Amino acid sequence: MTYVDLNEEKTRRLSFYLAMEEWVARHMAEPECFFMWQVEPSVIFGRNQDVYSEVNLDYCRQNGIQVYRRKSGGGCVYADMSNVMLAYITTANEAQTTFDHYLRMVVDVLKQMGIAASWTEHNDIMIGDRKVSGNAFYHVTTSFPAIQAIDGKQTPTETTVGRSIVHGTLLYDTNMRNMVGAITPSDEKMLKHGVQSVRQRICLLKDHTKMTLPEVKAFIRGHLTNQTLTLTPKEVTEIEQLEQEYLSPEWIFGHNPKH
């Protein structure tokens, strides 16, 4: 599998990495691609969610947490620099088959780290009965150059293919108060109760391994990928242009389902 590398140290907005996933799916011909990313405190919510119902926007503004909408379904996710986000792009089309393949790969890597991980029918990765990773899926259709034989002549044309994107979290550590506060009512008592409840339902990778987060990332990359493709400055610029769609207020706030 090919690791897609930015070859830069800086941390970008979450919207850039969403655009990068989509760009890779639409422009790279490799059958399987993978990359990891980290972001400053952010909330990412699903394509069909109502941001005003699902996200505590006041809490996010007060605590410097950015808000983004993704093109996959599913619920709200809080991310910060203490956890890592995984992106997997493949030519496979069927959602559950793609999920199962991806989840099996990640669970197998965690097991090689000595962690007794498993996955559920809801496409979560668990350690025991606690969640360490949530994942979502969406599909894109794109075209690649091809050659077609017409009347005995080789004629340039395009072929339309489907690409699947799976992205998810891997909780190494996190700011639990922000995780809960960003997606729950602002009442202090409810926030405290929410933190306690979340602590009972999720687990942190740091409690199950002696590896640091950079070591975990290196281990995953080393076991899942066998070659690297580094994006060119031109390709990064194209991703930045695509990112503008994800930054549009109309996209973030204007796609709320009708009540």
Task: Kindly give the residue locations of the regions a language model identified.
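Active-site loop/lid in soluble adenylation, ligation, and acyl-transfer enzymes
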Residues: 1-52, 137, 199-259
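Active-site cofactor/substrate anionic-group-binding motifs, chiefly glycine-
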Residues: 53-76
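Short, conserved charged micro-motifs
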Residues: 53-55, 94-99, 178, 212-215
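FAD-binding core of FAD-dependent oxidoreductases
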Residues: 70-85, 125-127, 153-158, 164
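Residues forming anionic-ligand binding surfaces in small-molecule and nucleic-acid pockets
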Residues: 71-90, 188-206
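Contiguous, small/hydrophobic- and glycine-enriched helical/loop subdomains that border
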Residues: 83-126
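A structural signal for small-residue-enriched, beta-sheet-centric alpha/beta enzyme cores
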Residues: 138-141, 158-217
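Intrinsic disorder/low-complexity segments
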Residues: 142-160
